[in-house]
Amino acid sequence: LYARLALALHETMHRHPSPEVGLWLRLCILLESPLVLGYREHRALHLRHHRFNGGPGDPDRPLIATAPPRALLCALLVPERAFFEWVRDRGLDARLALGCAVRAVLFLAVVAIDPAVFLAYWLSLRLSIGLSGFVFHHVLHAREGRVGSFALPGGPRVLRLGRWLFG
C-alpha cells in the first residue's frame, strides 16, 4: 500500500502544485519520520532533483554521487536530511512550522497506540524505503564516478530470474 501511495504522490508532484492535492496523498509521507516536510517542500525538492539531475544543485546528489556506504546512509536518512537541509537553507516559516508540528503530533499519536508494533512497522518501512532509494539513486544512477542511467548489474541470468519471479 505504501509503495502505491508513494508512486501516486510522485506522479502528482509532477502535475499539481500544493493547493490541488488532497489530504490522503499529503498524509502518505506522514509515518516516515516525526521530522518530515510537507507536500509543498517535497515537491520543490523533487522538481529540483529533476532540474539538476545528479549535479551540484540536486538535493539527491548525496544519494547518487558519493561512495556507496555514504549513499546508503543518506538513503536511510532521507526525511531527516531533507528536513534539516530545508530549514538550514530556507528557514522555518509559520506554515511549515505548523505543518511539521501537526505531522509530528500525528506521528507520535500513532506510536502511542502500540509502540512495539509501530517500531516493527517503522523499522521495516524505513529499511525498505532506504534500500530501495539506495538502489534507485545510487545503483541505477552512479557508475564509476559518472552520473547517468545505467542497467542493474547482474547480467542475463539475474534478468531471467527477475522475469520468472515477477513476470
Where in the sequence are the language-model features?
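Select transmembrane alpha-helical segments in multipass membrane proteins
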Residues: L23-L30, L161-L165
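Alpha-helical membrane-inserting segments
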Residues: L5, L9, V110, L131, ...
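Alpha-helical transmembrane anchor segments
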Residues: S124-G167
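Non-catalytic, topology-defining segments of multipass membrane proteins
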Residues: L1-R4, L25, I29-S124, G130
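Acidic (Asp/Glu-rich) catalytic motifs at the cytosolic membrane interface
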Residues: Y2-G22, E41-G54, L140-E144, F166-G167
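Short, function-defining helix-loop hinge/capping sites that tune catalysis or transport
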Residues: S18-P19, D58, S149
